[in-house]
């Protein structure tokens, strides 16, 4: 389908694609295009072509068409540029839609009915000694799983002991050599969680050198299962539970963490935004809460997160 680095799409109610009646995308590195606007009722025609890095396009494909009727539910997300302008600039940023509540949490968290369990899980993580392993990367997946508890407790209570444990995990990995397990998608995801969430919560407690090492490690790991935006896989794949359950969230978080400083991360984030926009209406979850590609938790968070950003 794609014969060069990019695809360009044309969408129009005119079968001849008259310029003044056609929505023309920029050349895109993925196999999808969202117009980000309500489409008028009637027949719409679309076509695509490949475009090389020099901007030279191939001949247009055959014409395809679909019909918009008045009974089709409408959902429109803003263009990615609007979304990107509203991204958080500082750290922490992963759960920016919760920041106002998290500022108040340390004073009230102890009275919350789930506080006891939250602290219990984090204290269980404190009792681990994974960072003392002679080969810490062999237990890095377990570190990532424990970081879920530590991050939640630290952001909720502001108790430094939880941050110290995350930092100990990360520093043990930074001082060691990655092993071959980093090609496994579950393992990669757990290690990415450890790195992104420690970077997020402890940004000012890390040295500039440590932050640089973490960033380098993240993108080394991401190349296996998360830096996939140019592969044309998920936008063309009908059913991929595993990607939507885990890898999408992890890819989104890597993009969010580094989009303002690294082009690859910005591209990853834009891909996630466009992929979610393209697939959400087909799922029906925007109407009934269901997601036919697996668990919906990360999508509900993303929906809330996008909404918070774009309405500011």
Report the location of each language-model feature:
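Low-complexity, Pro/Ser/Thr- and charge-rich linker/hinge segments at domain boundaries
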Residues: 67-94
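Short beta-strand segments within Ig-like beta-sandwich modules, predominantly Fibronectin type-III
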Residues: 23-29
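Short strand-edge motifs at loop-to-beta-strand transitions and within beta-strands
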Residues: 31-34, 64
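Extracellular fibronectin type III
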Residues: 51-72
